[in-house]
């Protein structure tokens, strides 16, 4: 009967030849995925070279967390016991015994270091986040969150499943101190860290398996998606973040993928549906193909209508990845490849009403509506012949279409017992067509009747066509030709009477980039020293050829309208717009080509004293060279065939009586300006962690960092932080106070006006700084076996300081005194304001009822975002909001699990940004405005099969 009791576990490998005492402290390299306890214990035993004995019924229905990295065998056994809820009865250095239930201290081997003195067995039975081994932001082996001297967050696969992020950016909400504007859909979302102004993705470096997706973190989330091939997320804020990676001074977020398994075949197959028409399949499979060789493949395919449905497939495409790994004594090499062909809709700001209390406009839902529609999903816009074409096709149904391939390697090799050499690198070939619309200036949103009666351009249009008999203006729908005129009829359009200017465009970008990290670590029982180098070489192309401003009504799935001149019989005799297009070349046509390289040398060292004090420091020297050829533009160029022009380009005869197709604004001149930036800079950090007891630690850190800004001057940063961490089965808590100073952080806005028919763009750049004081917390409370409460967030106070002002007119530096004095005074008054789109409060609370026998959990989520300001002037306040969500994770057995989540149950209208193209001051005094709300109520459900 005893043989049956321990059936299936575990004579997985040869016995350790070394003495038991040596085995206790022996460090090995582990790569064990999160999985069922019955298979995971086998895999761990094989890699540790020991026996593990446990009753089969004790492991049934239990799971272990991922165990990866270099750590002592006893530390690995602790993690298995902690995560699975088992207890470690004994370990003599060769054989470990696991069982269920409580155990007296006298029953555990007196030589067993797996149970620290003073720690009761029951305190180890719950998964402990602070005991997670981290590899991001450190080179020390076996580094845990508890003993780290940086602000570290680890999110396991289960944490990601519980979060059920609708985008990669939403996964970052698991990190305290990071504010995510997840309202843009799957891609191109904005996020910021520790009080930095929102908008963009600066100062946060997204990594995949320890390497940057891109050196300049833009559109990384088009090829880094949430999928079952992702094993976990690790994040480091400030501190060592700017040492061990490039352009990540504020934070490094590392998504770590599942690796080939040398010990067993297995994988995951997952089917997903949603309330917005998702049909998705995810898969991952790994298989050993020889004793020391293993492969894995994975990826997903999906399509859906989008939470905001444009009337066509919003998201469609796939990612496919594969890897092959070879191991040998003391070393391993993994070769990987990934292919992306994916299209995504990009959600932009929509018209809303109610400043300070946002509400839907009649006909356009703030939670589920959008302007995109089939009416203008496939159009052609006019371009200058100097671009190589006269028309640019724009396909919104193709969306943000990304095609990319990446190829990587990851090599580790032990050299003797104390040294480890590592080399990892990745080449990425990336291309995207960013087909989308964008909100325009807030002044372009208003009543149709007001625009026709009071807009200066409208008056000019009517005067232009008086010789043709025009006596009034009206609107004409492009799709049907219906003409609407008269104040009453115009005010009745869609029940709101509004029309809006938007911009449509197709931004093309391509990137060919290689990133690598190579170094050597010298590890002793009390010290870990790493010397390494980072290298990047990148070639980029970008253009916005074909952008155009157009007019629509305001409704869900809007329709284009023309502004037309009418005669007494209501016949059209002329038009301001062409098929709804008001102007061409809105964002300029100039293409750009850039090449840059970055070479960094870094050193990090961690010294351990008295087994309690860890002192670490690091420095990185970077040599950066950036060269760009930026296409030059001219103010406007005549469109051939539209009319007769004089030698100066002035229109003499309009062939078709359409004003919009006479000229292209900001047209490509066919020439380029050379831009260059070269710098040598050093980032450094010093930190310490003191383990007061096995459960309680304090830490502190100071760091300097910098961020490359392409051809612009790099931004310098300063960080200081200190915190306390506590870890037990009842409570895991990490509380951090921080100070951040962003130096020479430029903020620029364009102000465009028309003088004498000539468009003039005035740009005012403030070389400002930002100071932030704040506190972060990450707490998990487990008062009983069936209840868990997690809370994380940040409370911060950030303010702007204004330095030198630089004025430009149409791109040329001019005397500051030539700029409107009122504008200058206003900008100088921004000092002391809060940075735009930066909340003072950002909190997430997640209570969960844990089902017995490891069946799963039922959880809720409350997110609170404090008020933010849409602009640097703090003139438009976007109010605070709370979002409630809920979900369930349920395991039918070890192989089959179900998950479902409902996001924004209350259908709350929460605004993440105003109108980023609205200038310094967005509040125009109107009650209607552009803003981007979070998505409304939606649900996602999956069934997962592990094998």
State where each predicted segment sits:
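Outer-membrane beta-barrel translocator/receptor signature
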Residues: 25, 202-203, 214-216, 229-232, ...
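Short, acidic, small-residue-rich periplasmic hinge/interaction motif at the N-terminus
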Residues: 41-48, 100-161
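Extracytoplasmic beta-strand/coil segments of soluble accessory domains associated
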Residues: 96-99, 136-144, 149-152, 169-211, ...
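Gram-negative outer-membrane beta-barrel transporters
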Residues: 110, 119, 124, 766-872, ...
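Short acidic/polar hinge/loop motifs at secondary-structure boundaries
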Residues: 211-237
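Acidic/polar loop-and-plug regions of large Gram-negative outer-membrane beta-barrel proteins
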Residues: 320, 325-327, 332-408, 433-511, ...
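Structural signature of Gram-negative outer-membrane beta-barrels, strongest in the C-terminal barrel
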Residues: 511-513, 523-569, 590-742, 782, ...
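C-terminal beta-signal and adjacent terminal beta-strands/loops
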Residues: 743-744, 786, 794, 798, ...
């Amino acid at each position: 009967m005893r043989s049956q009791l321990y059936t299936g576990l575990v004579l997985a490998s040869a016995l350790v030849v070394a003495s038991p005492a040596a085995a206790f402290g022996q460090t090995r390299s582990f790569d064990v995925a999160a999985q069922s306890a019955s298979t995971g214990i086998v895999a761990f035993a094989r890699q540790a070279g020991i026996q593990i004995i446990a009753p089969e019924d004790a492991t049934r229905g239990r799971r272990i967390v991922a165990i990866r990295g270099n750590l002592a065998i006893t530390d690995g056994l602790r993690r298995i016991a902690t995560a699975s809820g088992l207890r470690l009865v004994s370990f003599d250095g060769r054989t470990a015994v696991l069982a269920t239930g409580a155990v007296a201290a006298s029953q555990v081997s007196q030589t067993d270091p797996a149970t620290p003195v003073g720690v009761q067995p029951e305190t180890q039975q719950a998964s402990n986040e602070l005991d997670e081994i981290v590899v991001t932001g450190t080179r020390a082996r076996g580094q845990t969150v508890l003993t780290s001297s940086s602000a570290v967050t680890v999110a396991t696969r289960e944490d990601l499943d519980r979060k059920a992020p609708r985008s990669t950016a939403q996964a970052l909400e698991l990190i305290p101190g990071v504010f995510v504007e997840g309202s843009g859909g799957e891609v191109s979302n904005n996020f910021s860290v520790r009080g930095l102004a929102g908008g963009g993705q600066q100062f946060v470096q997204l990594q995949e398996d320890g390497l940057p997706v891109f050196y300049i973190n833009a559109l990384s989330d088009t090829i880094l998606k949430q999928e079952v091939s992702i094993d976990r997320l690790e994040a480091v804020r400030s501190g060592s973040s700017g040492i061990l990676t490039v352009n990540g001074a504020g934070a490094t977020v590392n998504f770590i993928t599942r690796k080939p398994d040398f010990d067993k075949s297995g994988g995951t197959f997952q089917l997903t549906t949603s309330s917005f028409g998702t049909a998705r399949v995810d898969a991952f499979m790994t298989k050993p193909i020889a004793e020391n060789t293993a492969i894995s493949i994975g990826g997903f395919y999906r399509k859906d209508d989008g939470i905001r449905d444009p009337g066509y497939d919003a998201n469609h495409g796939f990612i496919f990845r594969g890897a092959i790994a070879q191991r040998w004594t003391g070393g391993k090499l993994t070769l990987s490849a990934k292919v992306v062909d994916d299209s995504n809709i990009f959600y932009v700001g929509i018209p809303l009403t109610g400043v300070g209390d946002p509400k839907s406009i009649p006909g356009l839902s703030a939670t589920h509506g959008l302007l995109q529609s089939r009416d203008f999903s496939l159009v052609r816009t006019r371009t200058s012949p100097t671009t190589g074409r006269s028309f640019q096709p724009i396909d919104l149904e193709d969306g943000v279409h990304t095609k990319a391939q990446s190829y990587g390697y990851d090599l580790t090799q032990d050299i003797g017992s104390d040294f480890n050499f590592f080399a990892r690198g990745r080449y990425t070939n990336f291309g995207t067509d960013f087909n989308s619309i964008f909100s325009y200036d807030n002044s372009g949103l208003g009543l149709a009747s007001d625009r026709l009666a009071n807009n200066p351009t409208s008056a000019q249009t009517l005067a232009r066509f008086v010789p043709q008999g025009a006596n009034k203006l009206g609107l004409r729908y492009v799709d049907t030709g219906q003409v609407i005129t008269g104040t009453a009829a115009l005010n009745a359009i869609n029940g709101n009477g509004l029309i809006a200017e938007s911009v449509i465009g197709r931004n093309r970008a391509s990137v060919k980039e290689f990133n690598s990290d190579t170094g050597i670590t010298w590890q002793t029982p009390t010290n870990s020293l790493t010397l390494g180098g980072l290298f990047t070489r990148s070639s980029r192309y970008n253009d916005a050829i074909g952008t155009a401003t157009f007019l629509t009504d305001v409704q869900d799935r809007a329709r284009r309208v023309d502004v037309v001149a009418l005669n007494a019989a209501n016949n059209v005799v002329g038009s301001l717009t062409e098929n709804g297009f008001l102007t061409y070349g809105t964002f300029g046509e100039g293409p750009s080509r850039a090449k840059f390289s970055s070479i960094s040398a870094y050193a990090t060292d961690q010294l351990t004293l008295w087994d309690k004090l860890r002192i670490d420091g690091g420095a990185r020297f970077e040599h950066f060279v950036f060269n760009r050829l930026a296409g030059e533009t001219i103010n406007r160029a005549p469109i051939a065939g539209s009319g007769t022009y004089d030698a100066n380009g002035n229109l003499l005869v309009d062939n078709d009586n359409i004003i919009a197709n006479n000229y292209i604004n900001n047209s490509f001149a066919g020439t380029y300006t050379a831009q260059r930036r070269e710098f040598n800079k050093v980032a450094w950090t010093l930190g310490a962690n003191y383990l007061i007891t096995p459960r309680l630690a304090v830490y502190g850190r100071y760091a300097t960092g910098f961020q490359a800004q392409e051809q612009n001057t790099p931004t310098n940063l300063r960080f200081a932080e200190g915190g306390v961490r506590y870890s037990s089965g009842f409570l895991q808590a990490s509380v951090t106070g921080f100070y951040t100073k962003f130096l020479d952080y430029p903020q620029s806005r364009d102000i465009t006006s028309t003088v004498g028919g000539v468009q003039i763009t005035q740009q005012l750049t403030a070389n400002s700084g930002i100071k932030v004081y704040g506190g972060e917390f990450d707490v998990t409370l487990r008062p009983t076996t069936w209840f868990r409460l997690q809370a994380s967030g940040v409370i911060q106070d950030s303010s702007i300081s204004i330095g030198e002002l630089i004025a430009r007119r149409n791109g040329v530096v001019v005397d500051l005194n030539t700029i409107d004095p009122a504008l200058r005074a206003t900008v100088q008054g921004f000092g002391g304001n809060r940075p735009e789109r930066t909340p003072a409060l950002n909190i997430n609370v997640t209570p969960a009822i844990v089902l017995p026998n490891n069946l799963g959990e039922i959880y809720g989520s409350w997110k609170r975002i404090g008020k933010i300001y849409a602009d640097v002037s703090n003139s438009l306040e976007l109010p605070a909001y709370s979002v409630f969500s809920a979900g369930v994770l349920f395991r039918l057995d070890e192989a089959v699990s179900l998950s479902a989540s409902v996001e924004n149950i209350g259908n709350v209208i929460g605004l993440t940004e105003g109108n980023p193209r609205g200038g310094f001051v967005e509040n125009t005094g109107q009650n209607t405005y552009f803003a981007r709300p979070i998505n409304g109520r939606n649900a996602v459900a999956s069934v997962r099969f592990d094998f």
